[in-house]
Amino acid sequence: MPQWLLNLDGGFLLWLQDVVRNGILDPFFQFYTQLGNAGLLWIALSLLMLCFPKTRKAGFVSLIAMLLGLLCTNVVLKHLVGRTRPWLVVEGLTALVAEHDPNSFPSGHTCAAFAAASAWCRTLPRRWMKSVAVVMAALMGFSRLYVGVHFPTDVLAGMAVGLFCGWLAWLIWKRLAAWRGWEA
């Protein structure tokens, strides 16, 4: 990674730590970021959506999107890029949660969040549901920065991969629906 990018990424994280972090927000973001462990929050919501006819398609498409995101981020990109977690390379940065995977690029939590949100924005019946999905995904990405376990570029890359996987899952759904004669 170029030194100028490390300085920019690290500087932003140190600013967050010094200016934004506080005793009121810390527990919230620690809790919220851990809801994203293994995609738990997004998988649970997707499975819940499968139970209702009006949201069944959204649940199915988001599960496909998250599976694609998992393959892209955690199976391929993290090992291919091998970027070290920020608290290990940014002097003075303290992580608020423990992460056992030493690779940070791209953010898997953010990828899962935006993969689900992207799928939901294409399939949920109400505008407010789509807005909530986007806000929840953005909060997940921000939480990864707030707790100090990802660089901003990790989160941006996770968001991009997640959006792509949501779009790809939607295309897969449309093909499958056309082939099976289901409503797309």
Please report, for each region that a protein language model flagged, where it lies by residue.
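Membrane-water interface at transmembrane helix exits
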Residues: M49, T73, L77-G82, C121, ...
